[in-house]
């Protein structure tokens, strides 16, 4: 599974399924048998308020906690209400049963610098974990706010989303990460606009080709500073 496929599955859970925060649960539907099981499997779930929530859940509600959302999807969860764990199978696909802190310890290229985060990376803070889905957003399962699998703002403020300030991020070793695609642009104007707005990673050969066609950049003050930066880069003066 690659990072984009993984994120699509995670977002699908957040957007298209009824979910509830249930400690120790990796996607089980809230059948009567599962309610009895999870009301007694963990001290957190034994709290009166949490037990009331679990018992009130409909049978088409799936239980998750933060790290078990990630593990559940990697273990094959597919929203099958007829299966004990919603289609997931315990500890398959080479993915171990670890905690949130254990999962970030398994991750690669762990960093506190969020300027280079990629779609599908785990985002972490002590005792809690989620998945970055792009555009400054993450998916997490938390008892906070909506008490379910939900989309939140990742280390930024975005209208319509609750904000979570994560500490670290890293690549899950159980999926592959596609390299960022470069984009070939047809005109100098296009490439200047794309670079100014941070839309794409563009190869230097494309910059060289585009500089020769920068008609708008030469006349529009808004583009002038970037034009000279490009010119210097292409001519080895940057």
Where do the model's predicted regions map?
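Short, solvent-exposed alpha-helical surface patches in non-cytosolic proteins
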Residues: 67-72, 178-238
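N-terminal capping segments
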Residues: 1-83, 126-128, 139-141
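Generic alpha-helical secondary structure signal
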Residues: 25, 42, 48, 89, ...
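A residue-identity detector for tryptophan
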Residues: 75-77, 124, 145, 166, ...
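Loop/turn positions that initiate beta-strands
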Residues: 119-121
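Extracytoplasmic/periplasmic, Sec-exported soluble proteins
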Residues: 2, 58-65, 112-115, 187, ...
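Aromatic- and glycine-rich peptidoglycan recognition patches
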Residues: 1-20, 79-115, 126-184
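Generic structural signal of hydrophobic/aromatic residues within well-ordered alpha-helices
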Residues: 6, 10, 49-54, 94, ...
């Amino acid at each position: 599974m690659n990072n984009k496929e993984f994120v699509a599955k995670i977002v699908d859970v957040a957007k298209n399924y009824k979910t509830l925060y249930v400690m120790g649960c990796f996607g089980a539907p809230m059948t009567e048998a599962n309610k009895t099981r999870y009301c007694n499997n963990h001290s957190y779930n034994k709290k009166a308020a949490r037990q009331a929530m679990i018992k009130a859940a409909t049978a088409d509600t799936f239980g998750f906690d933060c790290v078990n959302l990630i593990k559940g999807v990697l273990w094959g969860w597919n929203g099958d209400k007829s299966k004990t764990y919603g289609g997931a199978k315990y500890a398959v696909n080479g993915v171990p049963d670890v905690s949130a802190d254990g999962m970030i310890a398994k991750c690669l290229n762990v960093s506190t610098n969020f300027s280079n985060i990629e779609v599908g990376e785990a985002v972490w803070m002590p005792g809690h974990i989620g998945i970055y889905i792009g555009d400054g957003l993450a998916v997490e399962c938390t008892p906070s706010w909506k008490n379910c699998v939900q989309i939140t703002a990742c280390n930024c403020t975005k209208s319509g989303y609750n904000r979570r300030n994560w500490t670290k991020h890293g690549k899950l070793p159980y999926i592959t990460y596609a390299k960022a695609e470069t984009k070939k642009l047809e005109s100098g104007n296009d490439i200047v606009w794309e670079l100014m707005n941070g839309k794409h990673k563009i190869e230097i050969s494309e910059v060289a080709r585009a500089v020769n066609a920068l008609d708008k950049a030469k006349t529009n003050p808004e583009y002038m500073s970037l034009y000279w930066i490009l010119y210097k880069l292409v001519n080895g003066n940057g």
